[in-house]
Amino acid sequence: MPENSDFLSIMDRTQRRIQIIQACLALQQQVAATAKQEMDSAQQQSNDYGANVDRYDSYRTKMMRQRDMYAKQLSNANASIRVLQELLRHAPFDVVEHGAIVVTDKQRFFLSAGIGKFMVPYQSPVDVPQEVFFAISAQTPIYMALKGKRVGDSITFNGMTQTVQEIL
């Protein structure tokens, strides 16, 4: 992990924040596109198959269930995209709250939506190709532990102590 003084020494905080959010947004847009493609494919397969041959014929029903599953994934991805687009408008934070990007001495978090792990190009002279971030929702226990903290504050979560080094 880079030291606090090294982190963000190349870009200002606002630009870095935008870069991180855009990386997460690109990931979610890809998830949405894939879900839409799969949903359309399942619908097309169901249409091509035609009506059920008899009441025990479950292929069409299976395709419709798949379509519905992908439709739900698409809806969730689109909801996350809307949240991320809204967060692009926020300035960097001084305290950990929804929308903040938090760098601890152990991990990096984006407190936004439950998206999971994503990568961002590393902004340092150190030869590390990408930083790993975790986009987490407000319902997660780690979010609750971080909420309200400031730079220099520590939390203990699952037996691991982490110190907040930077908040964007």
Model-derived features: positions:
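Non-DNA-binding regulatory cores of transcription-related proteins
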Residues: 90-156, 162
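N-terminal intrinsically disordered, low-complexity, charge/repeat-rich segments that act as generic
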Residues: 2-90
